[in-house]
Amino acid sequence: MVIDHVGIVVKSIEDGINYWKKVFGYDQMTEIVINTRQKVKVVFLRKKNSVLIKLIEPTDETSPVYRIAKKGGGLHHLAFRCQEINNEITRLKTLGLRVVTNPEPGEAFENNKIAFLLGNQALNIELLDTGRKARKIINN
C-alpha cells in the first residue's frame, strides 16, 4: 500500500481551496463532488511532487465529520491505495485495526470501493480500491 492523500475537514470547502492555494501553493485538481452516503462535499488539491489533499465539508449535521468541522476542522484521515480491498481489510483487522465503514462505492472515485478503518493510534485510515477507473483518477 502507498499513501494516496491526506483528508482534512473544513468548515467551507471554497474557503479551504483558497487557503491551501494561497498558503501552500496547491491547485484544485477535481470538481467538488457530493458524497451522499457520508453527507460531505469533497475536492482534491494537488501540488507537484507532493501528496494530494482531500478537503471534506459536511453537508449537514448528521455527517460523520460535522463535529470536527464545527470545532474548526482538521486532520481526518490518511488514505492508502490497495488492490484487493477485502483482502487488505482482513489483513488489517488481524493487526488490530477496526472497520468503521465497510467497503462501499466512493463517489469521488467513480464508485470504486472505499472503506474506513480506525487504527490503534486513533487515526482514521481510508482504503481505496485501485480498480481501473480509480487508477485513472488517482494518477492524474
Model-derived regions, located:
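Conserved N-terminal glycine/acidic-rich loop preference
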Residues: G7-V9, I34-I56
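Long, hydrophobic N-terminal alpha-helical segment
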Residues: M1-Q38
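Vicinal oxygen chelate
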Residues: I3-S12, I32, V43-R46, I53, V65-N140
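Short hydrophobic interaction/assembly module
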Residues: V51-A69
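A short, polar/proline- and glycine-enriched secondary-structure boundary/capping micro-motif
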Residues: V23, P64-I68, K136-N140
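A cross-kingdom feature marking solvent-exposed beta-strand/loop segments within repeated
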Residues: M29, T62-I68, H76, L95, ...
